[in-house]
């Protein structure tokens, strides 16, 4: 099952030489989320991207109550829920072979919400989830603002926008073609299936 960014929280977890145990890493990631969102995520499940020593990680938090409810619905329906993951990670993993190494901005444009992953020098620099109008102008402004905030020249931009009815007219590499029907959820499913 893929979850929209509406149900997920994302955070960059910087490398720390002081961490030597998985429990310490989990506590550190929770502290990073609390610092970013201003509240503890005690009832959220946190998963970190596997990165080499010295590199920042992307952390994803999913509400534990939502995960438990999905498990219960699966049992009630006699279905086996094998995987629950943020759509961002599924889309990035599916598209990663198309991305050139080095500096880039990966943009997942969901309906009314976009998530941006900024990489430089082969390491994650930022992850940002932002409400965004469903227009090319709003998306282009978000991309430019993100690059300005982090002092980066406009890197190569990869756009994954499967719910759009038309190909966005942006200076970006399109990672999937728009769906033939207007259901963005169905389009997202097809894009990462």
Each language-model region and where it sits:
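Hydrophobic/aromatic-enriched cytosolic interaction surfaces used to assemble or bind macromolecules
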Residues: 1-193
């Amino acid at each position: 099952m893929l979850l929209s960014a509406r149900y997920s929280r994302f955070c960059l977890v910087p490398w720390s030489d002081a961490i030597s145990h998985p429990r310490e890493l989990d506590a550190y990631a929770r502290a990073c989320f609390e610092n970013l969102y201003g509240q503890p995520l005690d009832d959220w499940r946190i998963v970190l991207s596997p990165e080499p020593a010295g590199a920042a990680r992307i952390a994803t938090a999913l509400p534990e109550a939502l995960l438990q409810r999905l498990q219960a619905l699966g049992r009630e329906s006699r279905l086996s829920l094998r995987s629950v993951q943020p759509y961002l990670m599924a889309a990035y993993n599916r598209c990663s072979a198309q991305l050139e190494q080095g500096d880039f901005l990966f943009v997942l444009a969901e309906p009314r919400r976009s998530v941006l992953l900024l990489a430089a020098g082969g390491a994650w620099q930022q992850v940002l989830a932002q409400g965004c109008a469903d227009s090319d102008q709003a998306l282009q402004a978000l991309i430019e603002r993100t690059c300005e905030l982090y002092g980066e020249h406009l890197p190569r931009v990869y756009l994954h926008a499967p719910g759009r009815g038309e190909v966005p007219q942006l200076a970006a590499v399109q990672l999937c073609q728009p769906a033939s029907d207007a259901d963005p959820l169905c389009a997202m499913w097809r894009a990462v299936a």
